[in-house]
A protein has these predicted regions:
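N-terminal intrinsically disordered/low-complexity leader segments
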Residues: 1-13, 24
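Hydrophobic/aromatic-rich alpha-helical bundle segments in the mid-to-C-terminal region
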Residues: 7, 126-130, 146-196
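Hydrophobic/aromatic residues within well-ordered alpha-helical segments
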Residues: 14, 57, 64, 68, ...
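Generic hydrophobic, amphipathic alpha-helix propensity
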Residues: 14-23, 39, 64-68, 72, ...
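Helix-turn-helix
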Residues: 17, 21-63
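Hydrophobic alpha-helical connector segments
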Residues: 63, 77-108, 157-161
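Amphipathic alpha-helical packing segments from all-alpha helical-bundle domains
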Residues: 73, 103-113, 121-148, 156-159, ...
Length: 197
């Protein structure tokens, strides 16, 4: 007996399946190829389910950005929690998590690149990006406060660390033979040590 072309699932599972399919399409084919038809085909569902669950591809891409951002946040939070109570160790764990799976992942990089391309053209993605990065910086500011960095310096330090980590993460994912995770961590740690002096 042959497998049916489309499968049935509970609404939450179907929504997650569509979100994960969207991330794969974005990573593999880029934002310009993230159509209802391509995503439905990737998820193994009818195109009508995209409209049913999300109203259209734009809302699905927003949901995918939120999902991917939440996964990154969860990985960062888990690393910080596992580091114990020492403030400097917690900050180091936050940074190091960016250079290890599941964050240091070429498929994730490809998905983020697609999202970054959409920020300019789609206000909803731009707003979500701003909120996501504000959350990252807020977490860093909390970690920096625990490291006793002066309040006036925390915001700029969080921006600098975010930019530094993003740049190293990008290079690590694009050219792992040029920059490995250990070297990325070392560079980040040296710069953060200078910020904390």
């Amino acid at each position: 007996m042959s497998k049916p072309a489309f499968t049935r699932a509970e609404p939450d599972a179907r929504r997650l399946s569509l979100i994960e399919a969207t991330a794969r399409v974005l990573a593999r084919d880029g934002a310009s190829s993230a159509s209802v038809r391509a995503i439905a085909l990737e998820a193994g569902v009818s195109p009508g389910l995209v409209a049913h669950h999300f109203g259209g591809v734009d809302a699905l891409i927003v949901a995918t950005y939120r999902h991917v951002g939440d996964r990154v946040s969860a990985a960062l939070d888990a690393a910080v929690a596992a580091a114990g109570n020492d403030p400097r160790a917690r900050l180091s764990a936050y940074v190091a998590a960016s250079f290890a799976p599941p964050i240091a992942d070429r498929a994730l990089l490809a998905t983020w690149i697609a999202f970054w391309g959409l920020i300019i053209a789609q206000p909803a993605i731009a707003a979500l990006h701003d909120a996501q990065y504000a959350s990252y910086r807020g977490g860093l500011e909390t970690l920096l406060a625990a490291c006793e960095l002066a309040p006036a310096a925390r915001r700029h330090a969080a921006i600098a660390i975010t930019a530094l980590v993003d740049g190293l993460w990008l290079e690590l994912c694009l050219s792992p033979r040029v920059l490995d995770a250990e070297t990325a961590r070392g560079i980040a740690e040296a710069q953060i040590a200078a910020l904390l002096r």
